[in-house]
């Protein structure tokens, strides 16, 4: 939705074929509704955080092409454990995306494709997200945003 105070968003996030994403399930069997809710949370997060690295007039378009949430379901544990996401270092968060950064005139400043993965995600402190089920994915996106767009703020 358009915020009348801020105007149109400077960060656009879209998902390419989300039904084919590796793992965005909220339960072992998952549902379209659960997947869409999870992706909407990631979209909101990227829309909010992505603006921080932009210079005035710049716009950022991000297309997520795959998401594999940290952890996995281990149904062989049996019973009620079938729908519990088990987070271990062997199941790192992974996100594949394409992006395009444009200036106020619409000229492309930077663009590319990135395959993000954090094999050390279990070793990091994610204090701001401690109770957030997407804390590892959000930390991965924060790392990418700060590394990719840190130079955009420098004169």
Describe the residue ranges of each PLM region.
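Surface-exposed short loop/turn segments
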Residues: 64-102
């Amino acid at each position: 939705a358009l915020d009348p105070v801020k105007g149109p968003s400077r960060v656009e996030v879209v998902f390419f074929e989300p039904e084919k994403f590796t793992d965005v399930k909220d339960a072992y069997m998952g549902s379209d509704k659960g997947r869409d809710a999870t992706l909407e949370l990631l979209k909101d997060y990227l829309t909010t955080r992505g603006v921080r690295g932009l210079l005035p007039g710049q716009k950022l378009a991000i297309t997520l092409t795959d998401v594999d949430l940290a952890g996995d379901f281990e149904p062989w544990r049996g019973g009620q454990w079938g729908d519990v996401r088990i987070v271990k270092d062997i199941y790192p968060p992974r996100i594949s995306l394409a992006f395009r950064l444009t200036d106020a005139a619409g000229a492309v400043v930077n663009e590319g494709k990135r395959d993000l993965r954090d094999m050390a995600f279990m070793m990091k402190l994610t204090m701001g997200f401690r109770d957030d089920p997407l804390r590892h994915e959000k930390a991965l996106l924060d790392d990418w945003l700060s590394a990719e767009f840190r130079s955009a703020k420098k004169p």
